[in-house]
Design a protein with these regions (language model features):
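Short beta-strand segments enriched in small/hydrophobic residues
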Residues: 31-45, 151-153
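Segments of small-molecule ligand-sensing domains
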Residues: 254-319
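Beta-alpha junction/loop-to-helix N-cap segments that form part of ligand/metal-binding clefts
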Residues: 44-48, 62-121, 201-202
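Extracellular/periplasmic periplasmic-binding protein-like sensory domains
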Residues: 205-268, 278-282
């Protein structure tokens, strides 16, 4: 009886050890390929994304190897043929829209997380970005919640092209009554709101009487200028909520201005999406509170929902 029990224990122990060994070998054999430009016009943005990705990766304690490939002036299809192999469990990148279009044409067989979005799509490719369309959707929800029926739009001269996509997205997503104005009104009628599109310096110059039911965009918020009291805006939450130590660590290591802080947060969320897929590759629906907003992952797409805030005069509060 004693020998039989010992034999049974020995078999169970060996089975557990075997499963652990298989798991370990699987982890060692896995690899994540990251395709980002190291030079060229997008290199600075890519550097901040990489900074955020690596900081979140290090904080997570994951050991899966990362393979970095420079995409500048290189054909994406050729890069995939050259670097994707049996160990590649996921591809992250590219960043440029033209490269994402090339990526879709190449029809990758490995799950891929592109870091920009284009008109086309493939089931195997998740498109993840800091999209103006998502910013517009968050703003639309906020305006509806506040009972706004007519939105006055004040554009800083020279900034029209910069905000055109957000404005067009807002027009297409909302049934509000829109009106372009050349200067801020002295007061707003009931159910009227004012949307300012411009930079922080121009925002600070708007008369105080107009601040009630006033809204703006994320790039009008600056560390150098205090926003008007009561103004509302939608942005990546990590800038206002200290809930992600990896982003703080990345910033302390290499301080950058607020626009690049958003890209650090974006890189951190890109790693978290990657980690989620590696741990649950068959999952068809996942949600988490990310550094750049609420992230919803389905089998074929990723949806990011920025969060909205209000400046109270002493600080920013989550709405």
């Amino acid at each position: 009886m004693w020998n039989k029990l010992n034999n049974k224990k020995w078999k169970i122990k060996n089975k557990i050890l075997g499963l652990c060994l298989v798991s370990y070998i699987s982890c060692v054999q896995a690899e994540v390929l990251i395709i980002l430009p190291e030079s060229g016009p997008l290199a600075r943005a890519a550097s901040s994304i990489k900074q955020g990705f690596l900081s979140a990766y290090t904080t997570s304690g994951q050991k899966v190897p990362l393979k970095w490939v420079n995409s500048n002036q290189k054909n994406i299809s050729q890069l995939l043929k050259q670097h994707v192999n049996k160990k590649t469990k996921m591809v992250v990148g590219p960043l440029a829209r033209s490269d994402v279009e090339q990526l879709l044409k190449s029809k990758p067989k490995v799950r891929t997380l592109s870091l920009n979005d284009v008109a086309g799509s493939l089931p195997q490719v998740w498109q993840f970005s800091l999209s103006k369309k998502e910013d517009a959707a968050a703003l639309k929800t906020l305006l509806h919640k506040d009972g706004i029926q007519q939105l006055l739009i004040l554009r800083q001269p020279g900034s029209e092209a910069e905000h055109e996509l957000l404005l067009m997205s807002l027009f297409s997503q909302s049934d509000l009554n829109f009106k372009i104005v050349n200067k801020a009104p002295i007061f707003l009628m009931p159910k009227q709101g004012l949307l300012y599109l411009g930079n922080a310096e121009g925002l600070a110059a708007i008369p105080e009487l107009s601040h009630k039911r006033m809204y703006t965009v994320a790039n009008a918020i600056s560390e150098q200028h205090s926003p008007p009291k009561g103004i509302k805006f939608c942005d990546v939450p990590v800038l206002y909520l200290a809930d992600w130590p990896d982003v703080v660590q990345a910033y302390v290591k290499e301080p950058v201005d607020i626009s690049y802080q958003r890209l650090i947060a974006f890189g951190g969320d890109a790693w978290q999406i990657t980690q989620q897929y590696l741990s649950q590759p068959r999952s068809q629906h996942t949600e988490f509170q990310g550094r750049t907003g609420r992230i919803e992952i389905t089998e074929h797409s990723i949806q990011r929902s920025p969060q909205c805030f209000q400046y109270s005069g002493t600080g920013v509060k989550l709405l």
